[in-house]
């Protein structure tokens, strides 16, 4: 990270602090935390906007970190196979847990919220690939929720997208239709679909719906980002090309440099 970028971020945070009643000493402390977080994020492109948004979120007395987690899809060698759906500890939760524990070491006042992606069960094509009904999907997600509660630190909160953000699934479907129809997004969707093609083929999505599925993923990231930015929170996410949609939403986020596909 170039030194001039850090200087510009610090000046921006100092201005934010002056206008929002943040004591000057907290700016220096936040800058130290930002450097620590950057060292944890792996090889992602980190710019001034990313750092500024994250710094502003860290000024909160109790920063909320929302952690979206896929259901307990089958996996092998640390990568999802999507052969079936189980009701135990999800792979992504297991990969996020050590990252979050490290984050808490220098952010002891942070509030961790695990968000199980129960809304993914609303995709008929995904349920068909997993050979499960909607009822079974939801039941297994609840089983995973209980398993995480038993496994994680007691002060972490474990919930689902539907519980935390009522109406999230419907809103995401509506946004997906808008994104899919917008000409300005066509090239971006095509590029993201190309990156995700191996994943789609693993699930069994026909090529004719792959771009549409990418629009739905983009909408989920946008909708989550907009919800979290409203509470000045932070999102913790795995490595994925879809992180760019968080930038569109204006939300602060950190990348746990793990791959699951």
Protein language model regions, located:
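Beta-strand-enriched accessory nucleic-acid recognition/scaffold domains that flank the catalytic cores
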Residues: 1, 5-10
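Flexible, charged surface loops at secondary-structure boundaries
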Residues: 55-62, 104-110, 223
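Histidine-anchored nucleotide/phosphate-binding helix
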Residues: 86-107
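A substrate-binding/cap region within the structured catalytic cores of diverse enzymes
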Residues: 117-250
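Extended alpha-helical coiled-coil/bundle linker/stalk regions that scaffold oligomerization
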Residues: 258-259
């Amino acid at each position: 990270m170039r030194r001039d970028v850090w200087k510009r971020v610090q000046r921006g945070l100092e201005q934010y602090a002056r206008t929002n009643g943040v004591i000057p000493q907290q700016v220096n402390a936040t800058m130290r935390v930002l450097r620590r977080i950057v060292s944890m994020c792996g090889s992602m492109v980190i710019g001034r906007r990313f750092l500024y948004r994250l710094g502003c979120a860290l000024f909160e007395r109790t920063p909320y970190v929302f952690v979206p987690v896929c259901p307990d899809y089958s996996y092998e060698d640390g990568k999802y196979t999507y052969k079936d759906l189980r009701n135990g500890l999800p792979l992504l939760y297991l990969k996020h847990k050590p990252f979050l524990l490290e984050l808490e070491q220098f952010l002891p006042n942070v509030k961790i919220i695990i968000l199980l992606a129960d809304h993914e069960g609303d995709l008929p094509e995904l349920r068909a690939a997993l050979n499960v009904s909607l009822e079974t999907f939801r039941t297994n997600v609840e089983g995973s929720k209980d398993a995480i509660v038993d496994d994680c630190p007691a002060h972490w909160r474990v919930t689902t997208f539907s519980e935390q953000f009522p109406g999230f699934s419907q809103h995401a479907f509506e946004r997906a239709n808008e994104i899919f129809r917008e000409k300005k997004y066509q090239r971006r969707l095509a590029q993201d679909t190309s990156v995700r093609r191996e994943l789609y083929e693993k699930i069994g999505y026909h090529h004719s719906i792959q771009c549409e599925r990418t629009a739905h993923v983009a909408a989920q990231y946008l909708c989550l980002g907009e919800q979290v930015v409203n509470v000045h929170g932070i999102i913790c996410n795995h490595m994925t090309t879809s992180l760019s949609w968080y930038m569109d939403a204006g939300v602060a986020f950190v990348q746990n440099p793990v791959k699951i596909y």
